[in-house]
Amino acid sequence: MASVGKPSLEDARRGTGSPKMKARENAKDTLCRNVTIYGRCRYEDKGCAFNHDPHKNSNQSDNASKKRFNVDSPSFTPSLLPSNGSSPTSSSSSLKKSSTISPKAANAAPFQPRTAASRSNTSTPGVRQDAVAPDWSVAEAQEFIPQGFDPTHMSPLHGNGNPGVASANAFDPFVSTPNPLAAPGAVGPVQANPFSHDAAAATLGGAYYANQAGFQQPVQYHLYAPIGPHNQNALAYQRNVHDLFLPNDFREELQKKAAATLQTLPNTQLPAQVDYFHSLVPLDLNHQKNAAIFGYPSWVYKAQSTKDGSYYALRRLEGFRLTNEKAIRSVQAWKRIASGSMVTIHDAFTSRSFQDSSLIFVTDYHPLSKTLAEQHLSAGGPRFQARHNAHVPEQILWGYITQIANALKCIHSAGLAARIIDPSKILLTGRNRIRLNACAIMDVVQYDAQRSVADLQRQDLVNFGQLILTLGANQPNVIHNPSKAMEHFTRAYSPQLKNTVMWLLGGMQKDQERNIDILINGISSQLMSTFDSALHLDDQLTSDLGRELENGRLVRLLTKLNFINERPEHEHDRQWSENGERFYLKIFRDYVFHQVDASGDPVVDLGHVLTCLNKLDAGTDERITLVSRDEQTCFVVSYKELKKGLESSFQALLRPSRRPH
């Protein structure tokens, strides 16, 4: 009877096979190298013992890795212990293994590859797939969702294996949803696009910008913008390209205003025609009805006139019924007022184009203008709520006081009263450039209210003081707590400005005479400062206009050259032949625009073009060498001779032809 103990060395050697034979037995689980290198094995049907199915190998490796690294796998329990003195090989071959398994192994889920079912259903025994199908698909991968993001605001992604149904709140940056401002209550909440580059514009959406007519190309204001820093070491006679054109910020501002003026809104529910105006575009940033100022909800639109083709701003009072025709005739007096500090009023009429009775006021349109409430107060809209509102500089407030006093001087001199001096109704059309707006509306709406003009003019002074106090104290509602607002105002500004505001707030008191002329006399020192700033601005604009004068001269030269060169009637003219006296004008065009470098590449140098054209316009004595295209003719001429030939050739074109018809 064999004793149970450690097996002998000979038995261990006899039970262990050779490594070569063991490798041969496991060859069916090893992927053939020909499949890895060439994609197929030519000896697959000729006795190659290796595996030729890459999916089988990957599945087995995944299964083996899961068995090795799974912490929840059942513990190893040998089915039968070898007897004492017997080898494991002999005892395992003679005895029957136990078929019992552990409880953990019984509860383990069976391994099933993801693509096994698809391969078994689609593949055929006689056809072998050369292309390796991936073991995973994009649809099965979990989509990355940032923390704190509401997935209901985004539509499911389509394409790339991500099926989904578009929701009603889907975000599309290239499609503008029509916004029926005729029914403001129908406006829904704005959804946010977390992948937008501009976080503020994406969060606010339509509340930040006016509705666009789909995707638009950006304005091409960068065509002449200088690249890189300016060369401060340039000599006095040296010029840069940007010295000959408008400043970049000024050109950008003008082109943005031009783009805003030409903006349209297709597929809108606004009326196509309102009296003699068409192409209405809403200008309101807040789509909620507000009747606090006029007593009626008001809306502002941009429209084009069919009479002169110009663009105007239409202010509509919703639901207004005209009971007295004399009320609307009061606008005629406002049409005669021409002040640079007031928005000009052109017309007023009633209309039913909006399916109701509306009163329309026609005024000048100032593109990209903002109100003082939007510029300085957080109550101007959600666009300005996130910005820290600092105190308005005192010099800017004095500029506002000067301009409003100028407008009130013109209005009061005409025997009228502004009646509305509110931050939400004063337009900021430029840099610290303001204009009173919506002045004639109250004369029509409250025509039956009998108040003297002197009383209304004194009320203008009170409203004027409340406006400056509101801007200085940075509090929209100073009427509710004027003492606290004045306390903040006193700490931030000089005594002269404080005394001016106090004098305006006491405009209704009868203790002394108060009118706009007395106010202008009191702020005369600040008027001189504002007037001096206006003169400096005039000098700057004149200098910028002088730069554009250079462009006009160069355009005239280019026009003359193109009128003269390459005319078909000059093909057989001796003066334009290769030996003619005007042939050098054709070669000069190649010298300016068609130069090439040593490699034969075109030379695109704006500085060279501007230099040559300026010398041609001046007619200098500098000589240049002009070579024909076939390099057989060469001219050495001066710019003076070129200018003389250009003028004589152009005058010859203007003379009537003497050829018989």
Curated annotation (Swiss-Prot):
S-S pairs: none
Compositional bias of kind Polar residues: 115-126
One GO biological process term: nuclear-transcribed mRNA poly(A) tail shortening
Span list, region Knob domain: 564-661
Zinc finger (C3H1-type): 26-55
Location of region: Pseudokinase domain: 263-524
Superkingdom assignment: Eukaryota
Any single GO CC term annotated in Swiss-Prot or TrEMBL for this entry: PAN complex
Biased composition (Low complexity): 77-104
Position of sequence motif PABPC-interacting motif-2 (PAM-2): 63-83
Keywords of the record: ATP-binding, Coiled coil, Cytoplasm, Metal-binding, mRNA processing, Nucleotide-binding, Zinc, Zinc-finger
Location relative to the cell: Cytoplasm
Alphabetical list of SUPFAM superfamilies matching this protein: Protein kinase-like (PK-like) (SSF56112)
Alphabetized Pfam families for the sequence: Pan3_PK
Family recorded in the similarity comment: Belongs to the protein kinase superfamily. PAN3 family.
Function: Regulatory subunit of the poly(A)-nuclease (PAN) deadenylation complex, one of two cytoplasmic mRNA deadenylases involved in mRNA turnover. PAN specifically shortens poly(A) tails of RNA and the activity is stimulated by poly(A)-binding protein pab1. PAN deadenylation is followed by rapid degradation of the shortened mRNA tails by the CCR4-NOT complex. Deadenylated mRNAs are then degraded by two alternative mechanisms, namely exosome-mediated 3'-5' exonucleolytic degradation, or deadenylation-dependent mRNA decaping and subsequent 5'-3' exonucleolytic degradation by XRN1.
Subunit structure comment from the entry: Homodimer. Forms a heterotrimer with a catalytic subunit pan2 to form the poly(a)-nuclease (PAN) deadenylation complex. Interacts (via PAM-2 motif) with poly(A)-binding protein pab1 (via PABC domain), conferring substrate specificity of the enzyme complex.
Domain comment in the entry: The N-terminal zinc finger binds to poly(A) RNA. Contains a pseudokinase domain. The protein kinase domain is predicted to be catalytically inactive because some of the residues important for catalytic activity are substituted and it lacks the equivalent of the binding site for a peptide substrate. However, it has retained an ATP-binding site and ATP-binding is required for mRNA degradation, stimulating the activity of the pan2 nuclease in vitro.
Record's protein name: PAN2-PAN3 deadenylation complex subunit pan3
Species name: Emericella nidulans (strain FGSC A4 / ATCC 38163 / CBS 112.46 / NRRL 194 / M139) (Aspergillus nidulans)
Taxonomic placement: Eukaryota, Fungi, Dikarya, Ascomycota, Pezizomycotina
